[in-house]
Amino acid sequence: MLTRKTFHAFRSISGPPKKSVELPKYDLVIVGGGIVGCATARQLLIEKPNLKIALVEKEKELAVHQSGHNSGVIHAGIYYTPGSLKAKLCVEGLDLSYEFFDKEKIPYKKTGKLIVAVEQEEVPRLDALFARAQTNGCRDIEMIDSKRITDIEPHCKGLKALWSPHTGIVDWGYVTKKFGEDFEKRGGKIYTSYPLEKIEDNLKDSNYPIRVSSDPSYADFETKNLITCAGLQSDRVAALSGCSTDPKIVPFRGEYLLLKPEKRHLVKTNIYPVPDPRFPFLGVHFTPRMNGDIWLGPNAVLAYKREGYSYFSISPSDLLESLSYSGMQKLVKKHFTFGIKELYRGIWIAAQVKQLQRFIPELKYSDVTRGPSGVRAQAMDSAGNLVDDFVFDSGTGKLSSLIMHVRNAPSPAATSSLAIAKMITSEAITRFKL
């Protein structure tokens, strides 16, 4: 599990309210204390400061899962389909993020990023990626030759590369907590250790038509409107208000290696492969971290638990749910060889090092150790397709006009979080008549 920086200034979060406590009634409750939930809560109070808003989170603190278990990259928006929400919100979110970091004095580094073609057959795909980046409005992207590659990254070898100077790194878990701090400073209230169990019609007060409940020993929340940003649990939370189970969240664990401290000089910037469209993930890469570490990887394997960060973290019910899903079975059939190779690279470090040596030939097996892991909430449809864009839903029934669910917010959701928050806030103000 990753080590996260403790944000000592943030002390005002409340634990779960006991049944005996009479809670205030809220204009809006937000479920999920990750980066999208916290950014959205903050943005709503920026635009509508008189609203009474609560944010509930099932863990003891904010940013425990995806928001605190990620590569820390600030993405430029290169990869994403032109016209998609991913492309639009990432490019917008990049600038909003740097503006926020500067204003709040949050440490970050503009390390840049190389996407490197090491074989001739990869060059046409790199050219297509360059065209896509330009269509998406990514700033200052360059196509560079092998000499420029070594000028930027002396130990990296390649034929051609895309150079993205505005790609950077930051501690997204810390950023999430800053969003939460700002939300509370503006009058919002955060309740942790509150796992959501029910979303119901509130029969007690028609002015607050939604009842949100947890453990029977905890108080219920009564609210006019509800937004859920539940990450790895997003499909299950959406189902509580009658939404379809599709797309389903299938958890994929990514396992990193660490470059030993005496070898950190080998890597200065983010180094990525040219993505292969035949496969569903980007491939192994080199990622500098704010603390000076260099992460190598990750692979991508099915997690045995929704929030399972190791091979020994297993939930039989979660695993059965993933394996019995028709979409997962179709994905396995389509990418069986790829999946076996990913599993093999996770078990045998030398296999992953061999992939990394394509970019830095002098890297050795003895230069690396096992590192941290994260779990990605990947939405998948019943046909076995990985859902590639953000998905929002409301479900059906009496309460559907009062509820918004964020069903899929994969990478680059952290980079895009402030732009996503603006979009959700605009939609909420219109739909909920706030």
From Swiss-Prot:
Annotated EC: 1.1.99.2
Cofactor needs: FAD
Protein location: Mitochondrion
Main location: mitochondrion
Reaction(s) catalysed (UniProt annotation): (S)-2-hydroxyglutarate + A = 2-oxoglutarate + AH2
Keywords attached to this entry: FAD, Flavoprotein, Mitochondrion, Oxidoreductase, Transit peptide
Enzyme class label: oxidoreductase
Molecular functions (GO terms): 2-hydroxyglutarate dehydrogenase activity
GO cellular component, one term: mitochondrion
Keyword flag Transit peptide: yes
Cystine pairings recorded for this chain: none
Family listed: Belongs to the L2HGDH family.
Name recorded for this polypeptide: L-2-hydroxyglutarate dehydrogenase, mitochondrial
Species this protein is from: Caenorhabditis briggsae
